[in-house]
Amino acid sequence: MRAAADYRPDPDQPPVELRLPFTGPWRTVRTPAHRVPSHGTHAFGQSFAFDFVALDDRRRTASRSDWRTLVTTEPADRFVGFDRPILAPARGRVVAVHDGEVDHEARRSPLSLLRYMLTQGTRLRQGTGAVTGNCVVLELEECPAFVLLAHLRLGSVTVPAGARVEAGEQLGTCGNSGNSTQPHLHLHAMDAASPIAAHGLPIVFCGYQASPSGGGAPHPVERGVPRRREVVTATPP
């Protein structure tokens, strides 16, 4: 397994093995290879959580930039990841589905991000749905773990609670719902179906190509933990 030197999963807890839940190149924005907890908190079972943003063939997250990029919000559908298919990272059973949260305008400007941060407390008080947005929780078949995939597009979830899914089966599409400043996928593994009561579990991804954010030839990774800003692409199983 390849991981950054400061990644310290519990040695008594074997990592949850997953495949990347998307196709094409995505940049790793937050990762436990950089720090644990990766999002600055152990709350909601996200100690070992990942955030990924989709890229185009020029490694851009959005198709354009203009005056709105500098001073205000932007349409979510301007971003490459918006409405990209999100796939099951392993075989399992859908134990929870939440849909109905709107997709927000996206934010890249410092001013719009500051305004958003000032409303963070309000979202937390509104409950889990306001944080995760539209999401799917899977109970994995091959190990005692649950995986949450969050910030999906409003109305995009294609699987009902109770459904059994295979690895690679579409669950929904990437959106900008919940606590999200631009379309991205949040994923983490946990030891309970409800993130409120769960503890986070470490993850390794199997079968992908990785390359530095600044460019360079991709290299194959059999089992690994993507580094921060690393660009990853799933390889066929």
Give residue ranges: language-model regions.
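A residue-level detector for short acidic-glycine micro-motifs
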Residues: 30, 54, 96, 151-154, ...
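Acidic, glycine-rich catalytic/binding loops that coordinate metals and/or anionic ligands
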Residues: 37-39, 128, 163-166, 188-237
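Short, charged beta-turn/beta-strand-edge "cap" motif at the junction between a beta-strand
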Residues: 58, 100-102, 171-181
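Short, well-structured beta-strand-loop connectors
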Residues: 86-96, 159-173
